[in-house]
């Protein structure tokens, strides 16, 4: 849908082979190659071995708005879990950290929604340049 070539999982991430994921994804999970890299640091290293820039999507003090993040070229977006977000190790390994600007009383988004917004922004840039 957004041109995702690979999925790296780390920590206690639920794999695409889990029956609940397969049901939600309506079978599309099998279309994107994936691997469980172990720790967030190992996942970051695997991303770097592929020559990708690592951009974490997380609300931190030093994060830049998503529309200003370095999403051009070959990039890997890192998102954390629903409860705890990106780990400190992953944030430290990231080339940049970006947040999704929001208006309203709630300052967080479901991880699937946040991922879709970040992927759409990355693709929008490719399509408009």
PLM regions with names:
Residues 1-129:
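Post-transcriptional modification and biogenesis factors for structured RNAs
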